[in-house]
């Protein structure tokens, strides 16, 4: 057929994306539109990978996904996909896909020291229920826990939070988003009283300058990067500045790169604020009407175990989140310490580049979009980093309007929609509510139709704390879903793996593939993936989007949602709730958790006749009602009327997502701004209505050093992260042949001078050693990542190179998010003789 200009451009873009990874596109990825001669059924879905939320069209034939291409009706990506997105059709069909439950069995009974053997779902659930009941009986709800995911669908995350909090009365539920988005979430709430960005992707087409803080968008958010570059090339006045600790593909295309000493981004942020004040660039009217000032407690520790010497020395380790009221003059004095000279000396960034950056923010005519991700958030002062970039936008009034936007990019497809909005963190409930707030618990109990006082008000164990408590034998029944924690947790040798094999613990892992984590578990449950189930994600711009089940999962694989709901049938309230609650509310006595949580007149109120006639829905047909619709509508009731309004369920299947709050059928692009946000009163201009006084907070916080730095023995900074071709731990992308061939294994990126000093050659095998553990990798002195002297980078996608054996389990003491970007290592070549002896 004839190819239109737009189709040709799309094909060229697809080829370019594949060329970046050094691969050819398969024929199915080039099939941009299905002709009548191709008997495929096409349906919409969001991409399975990052938090961008690209739309894809999924082609199905004979019960199998055989093709995907970018959805031209999707506003996010406009028909484009990155190289990972073009190979979505292959992620579900790895040769080692798990299709039946596995359990460590010897002589027909569970034995923690036995090998994993195939069992039935009933056998697996029966043993799980026995272990959960034993632990609850002997130790109570504090000894059971679950580690979830920003890759859970909204329905799965909501079901998990109900089962854990209302069923088992435990708040030991946390997502792997703790490792990537916790600092951003806490920064939003402490500044604006509500989580998630005020802007949206439309800002890309309006900004005059883009400032990237710790974000390699070209590889980690490539589709959004194309929008940045398109804006840059379309408008000659637009500029891009990238701040990082090393050079990468994003810095290559930036107008200015600022390579700073690890951790000193805080000093740069305070310098910019100081420049704005000293040069009369403060938007006084905005600040006086819309801003309060506070000062943070300092010397707050590093989130290590309480007995660690750094925690013992910290003045405010137990009061890390505390701040005090302040004023503009006090704030100006604090940031006034960050002079141009001091900042240059501390950061290693030249005065010229620092001034250019500061002038960009200070100029009232330049609309600025600040963008950040893991470089900011995986930081022992990540919450402060988020505060300090908001300070700049608030001082200048460059916020909540087209092109003026501080924007936190997300890493997982539903880190926003599931982890944050649903509230699967150990301290949260849906719609920004908190478990330690009695009024919030009361509201949840009313929506969930629970006895008053049932919900537990004690904040649960966060992700790193869960690993520590498993090791210490205090967390004994543990379920990991939709993540690969043993590969991605920090300090895994010392703090993570011991807990999995602790004889006192029973560990379950739900996963589609035999990951490192699955192989260490006591029970492995085979999980349905992506379009093998009906789902919903929420992306980085507050866009909620849904998809139908398009194919069936292989063998006995079941979705996380089915697993959670089916497992609840094995418990009655008498077995999991306190007797005083049942005595006071006898109507609940003897009921199964399934009946209390799901057959409650709310979740089960939509019948099977409402399911799309031309699509499967395994969970709903198993349980006899439209599960996903019931869960969504109950969940949505938390936020409607409170600034988190979601549209009716059916509307999402008609569109390519909607950005909340959705009021009177209309989505909101810019929050807190009159004329854009229906919650802002007429004549107010801006209202940050998450806070009672409707003002945002400027938080004064200084530079403080990282938890660990290089010394004479461990003389290199280690940075970890991702690469374009692989996603997270690689459990999906490493099973796609084209992506595997494009980047077959992790390497250690190093400056050539550092290699030469150590007598190392490119491609040579080396030992990367920290105070906690070591791995082997190979030296790379060329390529995409150009390291300054004294720093090395190792991606974490490779299960044969578990770089997190070396990382430090230091966290931001406020958000509890891990710092994967800063620890000290040494690198030693593997001698020929040593290799020969192995």
UniProtKB/Swiss-Prot annotation:
Predicted to be exported by the Tat system. The position of the signal peptide cleavage has not been experimentally proven. It catalyses: 2 Fe(II)-[cytochrome] + nitrate + 2 H(+) = 2 Fe(III)-[cytochrome] + nitrite + H2O. One of its GO terms (biological process) is nitrate assimilation. It holds the Pfam family Molybdopterin. Substrate binds at residue 796. One of its GO terms (cellular component) is membrane. Residues 1-29 form the signal peptide. Its cofactor is [4Fe-4S] cluster; Mo-bis(molybdopterin guanine dinucleotide). Its EC number is 1.9.6.1. [4Fe-4S] cluster binds at residues 47, 50, 54, 82. The keyword Oxidoreductase applies. One of its GO terms (molecular function) is 4 iron, 4 sulfur cluster binding. Its main location: periplasm. Keywords: 4Fe-4S, Electron transport, Iron, Iron-sulfur, Metal-binding, Molybdenum, Nitrate assimilation, Oxidoreductase, Periplasm, Signal, Transport. Component of the periplasmic nitrate reductase NapAB complex composed of NapA and NapB. Catalytic subunit of the periplasmic nitrate reductase complex NapAB. Receives electrons from NapB and catalyzes the reduction of nitrate to nitrite. This is Periplasmic nitrate reductase. It comes from Methylobacterium sp. (strain 4-46). The gene is napA.
């Amino acid at each position: 057929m004839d190819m239109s200009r737009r189709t040709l451009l799309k094909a060229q873009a697809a080829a370019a994306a594949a060329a970046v990874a050094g691969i050819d596109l398969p024929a199915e990825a080039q099939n941009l539109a299905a002709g009548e001669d191709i008997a495929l059924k096409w349906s919409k879905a969001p991409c399975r990978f990052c938090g961008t939320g690209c739309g894809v069209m999924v082609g199905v034939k004979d019960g199998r996904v055989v093709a995907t291409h970018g959805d031209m009706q999707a506003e996010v990506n406009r028909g484009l996909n990155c190289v990972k997105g073009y190979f979505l059709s292959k992620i579900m069909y790895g040769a080692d896909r798990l299709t039946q439950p596995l359990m460590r069995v010897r002589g027909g009974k569970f034995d923690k020291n036995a090998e994993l053997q195939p069992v039935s779902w009933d056998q697996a659930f029966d043993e799980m229920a026995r272990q959960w009941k034993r632990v609850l009986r002997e130790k109570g709800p504090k000894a059971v826990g679950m580690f979830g995911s920003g890759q859970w669908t909204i329905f799965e995350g909501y079901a998990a939070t109900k089962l854990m909090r209302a069923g088992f009365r435990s708040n030991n539920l946390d997502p792997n988003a703790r490792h990537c988005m916790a600092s951003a979430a806490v920064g939003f709430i402490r500044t604006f009283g509500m989580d998630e960005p005020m802007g949206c992707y439309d800002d890309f087409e309006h900004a005059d300058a883009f400032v990237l803080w710790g974000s390699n968008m070209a590889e980690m958010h490539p589709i959004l990067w194309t929008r940045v570059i398109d804006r840059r090339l379309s408008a000659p006045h637009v500029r891009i500045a990238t701040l990082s600790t090393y050079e990468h593909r994003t810095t290559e295309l930036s107008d200015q790169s600022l390579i700073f000493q690890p951790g000193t981004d805080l000093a740069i942020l305070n310098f910019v604020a100081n420049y704005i004040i000293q040069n009369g660039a403060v938007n006084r009217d905005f600040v006086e009407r819309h801003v309060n000032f506070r000062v943070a407690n300092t010397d707050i520790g590093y989130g290590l175990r309480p007995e660690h010497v750094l925690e013992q020395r910290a003045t405010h380790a137990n009061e890390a989140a505390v701040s005090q009221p302040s004023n503009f003059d006090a704030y100006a004095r604090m940031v006034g310490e960050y002079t141009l000279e001091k900042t240059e000396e501390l950061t290693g960034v030249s005065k010229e580049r620092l001034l250019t950056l500061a002038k960009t923010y200070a100029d009232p005519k330049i609309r600025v979009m600040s963008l950040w991700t893991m470089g900011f958030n995986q930081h022992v002062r990540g919450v402060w980093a988020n505060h300090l970039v908001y300070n700049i936008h608030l001082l200048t009034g460059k916020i909540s309007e087209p092109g003026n936007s501080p924007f936190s990019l997300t890493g997982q497809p539903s880190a926003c929609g599931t982890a944050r909005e649903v509230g699967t963190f150990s301290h949260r409930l849906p719609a920004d509510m908190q478990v330690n707030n009695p009024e919030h618990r009361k509201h949840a109990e009313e929506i969930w139709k629970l006895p008053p006082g049932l919900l537990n008000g004690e904040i649960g164990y966060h992700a790193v704390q869960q690993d520590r408590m498993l090791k210490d034998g205090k967390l004994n029944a543990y379920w990991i879903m939709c993540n690969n924690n043993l590969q991605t947790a920090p300090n895994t040798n010392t703090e993570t793996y011991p807990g999995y094999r602790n004889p006192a613990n029973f560990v379950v892992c739900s996963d589609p593939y035999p990951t490192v984590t699955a192989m260490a578990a006591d029970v492995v449950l085979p999980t349905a993936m992506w379009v093998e189930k009906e789902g919903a994600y929420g992306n980085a711009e507050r866009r909620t989007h849904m998809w139908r089940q398009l194919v069936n999962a292989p063998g006995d694989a079941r979705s996380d949602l089915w697993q959670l709901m089916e497992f609840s049938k094995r418990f009655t309230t008498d077995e999991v709730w306190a007797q005083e609650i049942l005595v006071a509310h006898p109507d609940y006595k003897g009921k199964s958790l399934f009946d209390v949580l799901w057959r409650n007149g709310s979740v089960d109120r939509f019948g099977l006749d409402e399911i799309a006639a031309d699509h499967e829905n395994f969970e709903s047909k198993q349980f006899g009602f439209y599960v996903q619709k019931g869960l969504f509508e109950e969940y949505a009731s938390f936020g409607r009327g409170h600034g988190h309004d979601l549209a009716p369920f059916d509307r999402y299947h008609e569109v390519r997502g909607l950005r909340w709050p959705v009021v009177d059928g209309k989505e909101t692009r810019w929050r807190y701004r009159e004329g854009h946000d229906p919650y802002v009163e007429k004549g107010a201009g801006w209202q940050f209505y998450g806070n009672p006084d409707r003002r945002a907070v400027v938080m004064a916080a200084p530079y403080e050093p990282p938890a660990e730095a290089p010394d004479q023995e461990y003389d290199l900074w280690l940075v970890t992260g991702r690469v374009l071709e692989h996603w997270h731990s690689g459990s999906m992308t490493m099973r796609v042949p084209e992506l595997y061939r494009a980047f077959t294994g992790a390497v250690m990126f190093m400056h050539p001078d550092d290699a030469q000093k150590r007598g190392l050659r490119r491609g040579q095998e080396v030992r990367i050693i920290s105070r906690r553990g070591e791995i082997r990798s190979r030296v790379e002195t060329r390529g995409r990542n150009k390291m300054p002297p004294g720093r090395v980078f190792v991606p974490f996608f490779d299960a044969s190179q578990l770089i997190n054996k070396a990382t430090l389990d230091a966290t931001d003491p406020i958000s509890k998010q891990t710092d994967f970007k800063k620890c000290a290592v040494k690198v030693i070549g593997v001698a020929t003789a040593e290799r020969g002896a192995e």
